[in-house]
A protein has these predicted regions:
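A short, charged, and often flexible helix/loop element on the N-terminal side
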Residues: 41-72
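Short catalytic/ligand-binding loop motif for oxyanion handling, primarily in non-cytosolic enzymes
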Residues: 14-15, 46-48, 91-94, 117-120
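Short connector loops at secondary-structure junctions
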Residues: 37-47, 113-117
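Short His-centered aromatic/hydrophobic patch
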Residues: 85-91
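Short beta-strand scaffold positions
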Residues: 85, 143-144
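Membrane-proximal helix-turn-helix segments that form the acceptor-binding/catalytic region
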Residues: 68-80, 92-110, 116-117, 124-143
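Surface-exposed, active-site-proximal loop segments in enzymatic domains
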Residues: 51-54, 122-127
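N-terminal subdomain of nucleotide-sugar transferases
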Residues: 1-41
Length: 144
């Protein structure tokens, strides 16, 4: 059975973009013989405060926890055949994490949202807007 590691920003069924782009296909993929491992960067508790005013400490803590979750995901690469990335694997900084996935030799499917290209220049530097260009250049398959 082929295994797909799905790296996404938000918990399953929480974000409309994820539901519309790929979550609706989970049952079909599993019926076709794929085993899915899903890993969101943000936890449900972080999602609950992410877009609200305040809660800065919870947002920072949730982001740090997300990076630890992604480090743990590197160990899951051995058991998967394909890595499916929706929007980004990590939200900030250089595409180092994405480079590690590339160096693992796993095929990457990159499903990007056009919103990743609508960042202002200073926000793009912080959020790693060039990650999308890196993933577009190095992925085996691109979905837009």
């Amino acid at each position: 059975m082929k295994k797909i590691l799905i790296l996404c920003p938000y918990p399953e069924s929480m974000a409309a973009g994820q539901r519309l782009k790929y979550e609706q296909y989970f049952e079909s993929w599993e019926a076709s013989g794929y085993e899915l491992q899903k890993s969101s960067f943000f936890s449900i508790s972080t999602w609950d405060v992410l877009w609200s005013k305040g809660h800065l400490l919870r947002k920072i803590t949730g982001t740090i926890q997300g990076y630890f979750r992604r480090i743990n995901d590197l160990y899951k690469l051995q058991g998967c055949d394909v890595v499916y990335i929706f929007m980004w694997a990590t939200p900030l900084g250089l595409p180092f994490y994405e480079w590690l996935i590339l160096k693992s030799g796993k095929k990457i499917i990159y499903d990007f949202d056009d919103a990743v290209f609508n960042l202002s220049d200073h926000i793009s530097l912080i959020k790693g807007g060039y990650k999308s260009r890196f993933l577009i250049k190095h992925s085996h398959q691109i979905i837009s």
